[in-house]
């Protein structure tokens, strides 16, 4: 029997309680609309009525939707920093050239050892081969209409990379308006963003361009970024179908300040070590999508996306004084599709019923080359890999409402993985491990206790495979996928007249045979991309509160506790039994307030904090990385759709660092000090 069926009794009981609760509740209360587990903060652009798919509101988990008005005016060096406004999300800030940072949640860290979040941009999968999210930086804040964050293992729509959940970036669509902004600020920051929407008849067009140049907080930290995007859609006059093309291009060139030792990071955080003087990086990203949404009948809708992704990255990096400089080159092309069909018939045996199914596939072609270098001149090859990976998946789920208060969502997903790895330096070839059919059952339930309160629970399975050569059979023994079996239960509250809402939740995820990427900082010729971690347990709880008492005020508060433990270690590392996984802080917190002080003046304050973390799995080298940062903002409406705004980041000039440890080496990257930004924006 699959271990999924022997999940903690508490999870099963929560689902069962949601199923049997109507027997008493409906007799004493009038029917009410089914609740959900979603919290929305800010204003969200309405979606096209032809857009099909599992709305986030049908995923009964910790789902958060952030409106574009919370994000579009934010000053950030990389887009991942926008996720600091999301509850329960950890952002790991490398601040090394094009490697600005990554986000994660549910007890996974963002270092890149295990990339556990599926990223989508307007429905297009946007992770690279190892699950990282380089495509995210191609989207600038002004273009974003909303962020949808789904934490949990119960969404069947996505397989590969969706170990802990998914994040979708929705960009602006349609409209006959334009917006532009010009920013100057600390550390030589200069930025321009502009967008234009055009609608006429059934045609809609959207254009976006951005440029950002910065000297950086530290020495040898210059960066220049450019982004361009466009959408072209046509909607049938009878609104029976909609077809369109989307395209995106991004270019980033940056110097790398280098990692510091602990003493220097404390005494001279803005310095750059001598050995990093030749470090730099460059990145190019392209993304094209073809989209078709159709209403096939009164009860059937479909949605299909074809896409092409291209990711090129070149980096020269020396991690420590004792290591050597490396050139790391990546060139990856992805081609894929997603297609789904939903059927919503009229039934007399339930309040409502819907059935949805989908298929998807992705074909990756990647090269990964590494060299030892001196001042960016190659001296010795370290790696010459050429590999392809293809995945296929299918899912089905039902959305059943047997009564006005209860909603059930059973689902099932299967994935298949194949491909071939070629080590060009040795001529060796390897197939992928015989993963077989990767089965992932899911079940969610929500029960509306009162007009203001809904209880929900879910249980589900996700999976992980190795990245790089870690997915291929380079050894005699076959390996299966690592399964993550998770469950969650929570309660959502909605206040009178929807002036406040809140959610509390408890969750767990257990992984079998978890693997993690080896960074290879010492510049040696490595045979493996990943190493075994063992069986792990992640668990925690979240509490969130959003207040919007009137049109002038909006407040939010979120707090998450989490632990990530190794229950059964890799046989070669018995000392890690019962220890914590590296770079996972015990708590994450965020809070903020927006106040429309007058008809023209808006004042804002927001901040985020995280606890310390261990940097390696034996937990013997101390804890680092904790911080609490506060920010202030003010905007003044000049009239005629013009506005000037000011943001003061890291108000108290708090010193904080990102710390890593790998292969006996360690380094620290200081975060930005106090910074001031001034923006002039206007619309038409």
PLM feature segments, named:
Residues 27-72, 293-295:
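Short, acidic, small-residue-rich periplasmic hinge/interaction motif at the N-terminus
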Residues 609-616, 635-684:
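C-terminal beta-signal and adjacent terminal beta-strands/loops
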